[in-house]
Amino acid sequence: KHSLPDLPYDYGALEPHINAQIMQLHHSKHHAAYVNNLNDTEEKYKEALAKGDVTAQIALQPALKFNGGGHINHSIFWTNLSPNGGGEPKGELLEAIKRDFGSFDKFKERLTAASVGVQGSGWGWLGFNKERGHLQIAACPNQDPLQGTTGLIPLLGIDVWEHAYYLQYKNVRPDYLKAIWNVINWENVTERYMACKK
């Protein structure tokens, strides 16, 4: 069974950039719903497998992708944020960003543009392309998980579902994007980068 991970900080810790009300609803209601629905879907899937019911297995795929993706994405997202975040990464990750995007500012512009440009709900991502050995920006619709749908290893995810910002930023997604850079946990992103290079 999957369970809701604890946040590594208090709900109000990311103020004023992301307010406590958003964090509480986002974590304790939205993420919790993905976890519960994923567990329910997996139970139904096991039953369908046991019965050899391929039609039922196929019918469950969208729910598995949506709720499984929601759980994977949010579990990464919470650790990608920190009250002590912001600034720029250091060391090898910064060098890789400069190599693959020209500069940190250009990278920031591109990931912001990809995230703002998601139509409807979805995610902006910095991922690692293991085959080519470099960083890549991608956007995924809904809760589609980055690795499961593109093969890129997720390093940094930006949630652009309205539930991630609407209570504070209303319909002005670019303002939310501007604010979130102040709480990006570059240590966590760097750890993810170093792990996938091994």
Swiss-Prot record:
Query: Does the record bear Calcium in its keywords?
Result: no
Q: How is the cofactor bound?
A: Binds 1 Mn(2+) ion per subunit.
Q: Which residues are annotated with the PTM N6-acetyllysine? A: K44, K51, K90, K98, K106, K178
| Subcellular location, record wording | Mitochondrion matrix
The protein's predominant localisation is mitochondrion
Q: Which GO terms describe its cellular component?
A: mitochondrial matrix
The cofactors it requires, by name, are:
Mn(2+)
Indicate yes or no for the key word DNA repair. no
Q: Which GO terms describe its biological process?
A: cellular response to oxidative stress; regulation of transcription by RNA polymerase II
Cited PROSITE patterns? SOD_MN
For this protein, the record's Pfam families field holds: Sod_Fe_C, Sod_Fe_N
Post-translational modification summary for this protein: Nitrated under oxidative stress. Nitration coupled with oxidation inhibits the catalytic activity.
Please name the InterPro entries in this protein's record.
Fe/Mn_Superoxide_Dismutase, Mn/Fe_SOD, Mn/Fe_SOD_BS, Mn/Fe_SOD_C, Mn/Fe_SOD_N, Mn/Fe_SOD_N_sf, SOD_C_sf
Query: Which Gene3D superfamilies does this chain map to?
Result: Fe,Mn superoxide dismutase (SOD) domain (1.10.287.990), Iron/manganese superoxide dismutase, C-terminal domain (3.55.40.20)
- Write down the chemical reaction(s) this protein catalyses: 2 superoxide + 2 H(+) = H2O2 + O2
**UniProt KW keywords:** Acetylation, Manganese, Metal-binding, Mitochondrion, Nitration, Oxidoreductase, Ubl conjugation
**Which residues are annotated with the PTM 3'-nitrotyrosine?**
Y34
Residue positions, PTM N6-succinyllysine = K44, K51, K98, K106
Q: What is its EC number?
A: 1.15.1.1
According to the record's subunit comment, the protein's assembly and interactions are: Homotetramer.
Question: What is the official name of this protein in its record?
Answer: Superoxide dismutase [Mn], mitochondrial
Q: List the taxonomic lineage.
A: Eukaryota, Metazoa, Chordata, Craniata, Vertebrata
